[in-house]
């Protein structure tokens, strides 16, 4: 396209050159047309410069098109790479989802295996109990037990394999996440490259559009110069015709000059008056030109100030872009904190799951404790049935003293104290009952003495076991109370978390409202840009008006040329020339009024622009204040982030300690299981002894008692040690509760701080707004550059008008001097021919009058 344009341009230039040479030859033949020939050469030089600049612009447009095509290919390749990276990210996400599914399957299998193992443990416990109760097992039961043991070992091996597979899946998942993060980073880099290339392409396109507009403007000016050249050539031809007609009129004037000799003096007086009037008008015109030049200098100074203000605005915009970059970095750090918060929440969910498992186990233990309580009640009833002697009464008193000591031990536990008080009340009632029965059974004491001795050992053993069972029951109840307190605490935390979620939703709505406000501000800025665009169009219209004024000035030059030719007409038409001069004065007065009005309009526009600049400065100050406030808030957020990192490290350390303490649960489970087995064994022994007592094989058997009752001092020491241990454990529990409350408070503060941070949606909208702001800034810069270019063109046109006016005045002066000399010579020859040489010598004033008249006419022509 550019090559075709250049070939057409060279062809048109060749035709114009031929026309120029032809017209130049015609002008060179006539010496009178030398000034027009000089002006014609100037116009041709300007036209030739226009052609050269147009060719240069066409070449530059071709280079810009090649750059745009190259950048477009780069953008396509970058987009292709971006698409490939997106596909890779999708594939990696699918692999991650698949890995998570496999992890879930493995966890389900692991839970099933645990349940199966638990069932097998229960069955093994039942079988072991049956083994202890019965005399022996059948062959089929032994085989079933062996099969169950084999299944247990197989399930254990399968569980270990599942755990190894789960660890493998977790390592694969971590590797996949690392790959995904690397792919995301590469994608972000490619997106940044694409944005950079797009910005480069937009800059190239804007430059190409500016060059195209400049080319169109040069083409338009070239057409106007061609039209002016054609008009000048037609004017030259018409002036040649006027010169021939003027020569004919000169001949007639010489004939008419003889007849007008007597009217010359009267005309001379009127002409002198008109000359004075014209000089006065000329002086006024010079003063008006001086005022116009002053206004032009003031306007140029205002334009310089406007450029300085625009440079300050561009510096402020650069500072705003730097602040936006800092805000983007803050948003990235906030995202990282959000990811850390998500990880902490995941760990919290895991702990909650473990807590739920512990609660289930605690419920199972509670059921076992209830069963043990029932068995203890049965044993106490059996014991009460056998306590029929005075020895039993003494033992009851000892038990009552022990009960009182135990009541003092468990004053802190309200639930257990109530149970013990009820039991004591029941025992007291039974004691009264036994007192009545003791009076009746005194005669039976001797018969039951031997039986009592046999059962005392069994009763003491049972009491010892009952005390141990009660202590274990108390421990289980303490554990149950601690777990229940933890459950209440976590339920309270759940309620607080739900409240925080509601608060975050409310903040999200507020942020949505703020986003809507930002959108409204952007629409306001768009309206402001449209207003600036319309003002730019107004400046273009003013440029067109100035161009029209230039055309009018050229037409004025043509009218002045016609006035020069009209001065060759006969002297009788001087009155008509004076009237035309009055009309010219009125027209110039109108033009002067128009110029004054335009000056007033420019003054009002300048005032409005100053007001707009003041408003812009106010906005800039407000934005600077908001930026400073944002910087202070940003520093505060950094300090909070550092504090939160320290607290997060403490929380992780405490979480690790808690996990290590949780690992002791398996040991406790094993101890509970071992104690259960021992309890079953003891029950079988008790049952066997009771059967032997009911059905004794050897009635007269007896043996020496090896055991003895523990002393009261030893029991008190044991109770005191147990009380000390209980107090220390209670203090540890209180410290742990305080520590947990402090960590929960710290966690809530961290969560609130994270909730105040903006989300990724706000960051995306902010990036979109920043991109729109950059585009609008580029548009404003382009419009400002075009405005400066048009103002420079207007100044060039004004300087060109002044130069043409000066050249016209110089040409008029030269022409009038030449005509004055010619008329003086003609008048002198005419007088010499009319009066003769002797009479010419006697009339020195005649030539002076004629020359004076011509000089006055020259003065009129000058005006």
Swiss-Prot record:
List residues traversing the bilayer. none
Q: Where is the composition biased (Gly residues)?
A: 845-863
Q: So which domain of life are we looking at?
A: Eukaryota
Q: Where is this region: Disordered?
A: 836-863
The record's Gene Ontology biological-process terms are: cilium-dependent cell motility
Q: Where in the cell is it found?
A: Cell projection, Cilium, Flagellum
* GO cellular component terms listed in the entry, alphabetical order: axoneme; cytoplasm; motile cilium
Q: Could you list the residue ranges forming a coiled coil in this record?
A: 107-600, 631-815
Keyword entries, A-Z: Cell projection, Cilium, Coiled coil, Flagellum
One matching Pfam family: CFAP58_CC
Its chief place of residence is other
Q: What family is this protein classified in?
A: Belongs to the CFAP58 family.
Protein name, per record = Cilia- and flagella-associated protein 58
The UniProt gene name for this protein comes to CFAP58
């Amino acid at each position: 396209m550019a090559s075709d344009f250049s070939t057409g341009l060279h062809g048109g230039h060749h035709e114009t050159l031929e026309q120029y040479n032809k017209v130049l030859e015609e002008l060179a033949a006539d010496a009178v047309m030398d000034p027009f020939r000089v002006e014609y050469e100037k116009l041709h030089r300007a036209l030739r410069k226009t052609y050269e600049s147009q060719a240069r612009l066409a070449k530059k447009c071709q280079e810009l098109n090649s750059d745009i095509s190259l950048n477009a290919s780069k953008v396509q390749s970058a987009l292709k790479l971006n698409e490939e990276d997106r596909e890779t990210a999708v594939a990696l996400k699918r692999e991650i989802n698949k890995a998570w599914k496999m992890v879930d399957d493995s966890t389900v299998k692991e839970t099933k295996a645990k349940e199966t193992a638990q069932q097998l443990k229960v069955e093994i416990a039942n079988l072991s109990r049956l083994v202890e109760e019965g005399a022996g097992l059948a062959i089929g039961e032994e085989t079933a037990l062996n099969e169950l043991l084999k299944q247990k070992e197989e399930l254990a091996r399968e569980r270990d394999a599942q755990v190894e597979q789960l660890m493998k899946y977790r390592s694969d998942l971590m590797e996949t996440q690392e790959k995904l993060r690397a792919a995301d980073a590469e994608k972000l880099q490619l997106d940044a490259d694409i944005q950079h290339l797009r910005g480069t392409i937009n800059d190239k396109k804007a430059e190409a559009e500016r060059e195209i507009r400049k080319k169109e403007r040069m083409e338009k000016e070239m057409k106007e110069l061609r039209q002016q050249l054609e008009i000048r050539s037609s004017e030259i031809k018409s002036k040649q015709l006027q010169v021939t007609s003027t020569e004919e009129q000169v001949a007639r004037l010489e004939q008419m000059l003889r007849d007008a000799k007597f009217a010359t003096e009267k005309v001379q007086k009127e002409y002198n008056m008109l000359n004075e009037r014209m000089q006065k008008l000329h002086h006024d015109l010079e003063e008006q030109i001086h005022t116009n030049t002053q206004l032009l200098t003031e306007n140029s100074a205002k334009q310089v100030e406007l450029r300085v203000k625009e440079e300050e605005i561009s510096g402020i915009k650069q500072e705003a872009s730097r602040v936006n970059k800092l805000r983007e970095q803050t948003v990235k750090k906030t995202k990282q904190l959000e990811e850390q918060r998500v990880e902490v929440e995941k760990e919290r969910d895991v702990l909650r799951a473990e807590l739920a498992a512990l609660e289930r186990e605690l419920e199972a233990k509670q059921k076992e404790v209830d069963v043990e309580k029932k068995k203890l009640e049965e044993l106490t009833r059996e014991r009460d049935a056998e306590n029929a002697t005075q020895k039993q009464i003494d033992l009851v008193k000892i038990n009552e003293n022990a009960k009182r000591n135990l009541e003092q031990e468990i004053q802190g536990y309200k639930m257990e104290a109530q149970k013990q008080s009820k039991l004591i009340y029941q025992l007291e009632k039974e004691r009264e009952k036994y007192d009545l029965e003791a009076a009746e059974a005194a005669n039976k004491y001797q018969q039951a003495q031997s039986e009592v001795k046999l059962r005392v050992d069994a009763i003491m053993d049972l009491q010892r076991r009952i005390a141990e069972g009660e202590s274990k029951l108390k421990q289980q109840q303490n554990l149950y109370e601690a777990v229940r307190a933890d459950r209440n605490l976590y339920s309270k935390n759940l309620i607080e978390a739900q409240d925080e979620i509601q608060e975050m939703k409310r903040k999200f709505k507020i942020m949505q409202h703020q986003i809507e406000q930002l959108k409204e501000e952007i629409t306001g800025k768009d309206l402001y840009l449209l207003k600036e665009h319309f003002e730019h169009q107004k400046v273009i219209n003013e440029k067109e008006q100035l161009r029209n004024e230039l055309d009018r000035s050229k037409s004025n030059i043509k009218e002045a040329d016609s006035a020069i030719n009209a001065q060759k007409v006969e002297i009788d038409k001087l009155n008509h020339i004076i009237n035309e001069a009055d009309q010219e004065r009125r027209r110039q007065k109108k033009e002067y009024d128009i110029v004054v009005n335009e000056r007033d309009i420019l003054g009002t526009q300048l005032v409005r622009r100053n007001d707009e600049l003041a408003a812009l400065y106010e906005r800039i100050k407000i934005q600077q204040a908001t930026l400073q406030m944002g910087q202070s808030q940003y520093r505060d957020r950094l300090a909070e982030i550092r504090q939160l990192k320290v607290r997060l490290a403490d929380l992780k350390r405490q979480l690790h300690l808690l996990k290590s303490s949780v690992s002791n649960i398996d040991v406790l489970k094993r101890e509970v299981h071992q104690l259960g087995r021992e309890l079953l064994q003891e029950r079988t022994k008790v049952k066997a002894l009771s059967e032997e007592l009911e059905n004794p094989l050897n009635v007269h058997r007896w043996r020496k008692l090896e055991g003895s009752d523990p002393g009261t001092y030893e029991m008190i020491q044991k109770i005191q040690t147990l009380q000390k241990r209980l107090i220390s454990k209670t203090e540890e529990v209180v410290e742990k509760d305080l520590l947990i409350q402090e960590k929960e408070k710290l966690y809530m503060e961290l969560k609130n701080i994270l909730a105040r941070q903006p989300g990724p949606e706000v960051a995306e909208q902010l990036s979109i707004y920043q991109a729109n702001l950059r585009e609008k800034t580029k548009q404003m810069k382009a419009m400002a550059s075009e405005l400066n270019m048009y103002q420079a063109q207007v100044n060039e046109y004004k300087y060109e008008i002044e130069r043409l006016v000066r050249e016209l005045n110089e040409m008029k002066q030269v022409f009038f001097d030449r005509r004055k000399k010619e008329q003086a010579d003609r008048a002198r020859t005419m007088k010499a021919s009319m009066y003769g040489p002797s009479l010419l010598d006697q009339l020195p004033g005649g030539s002076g009058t004629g020359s004076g008249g011509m000089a006055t006419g020259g003065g009129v022509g000058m005006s």
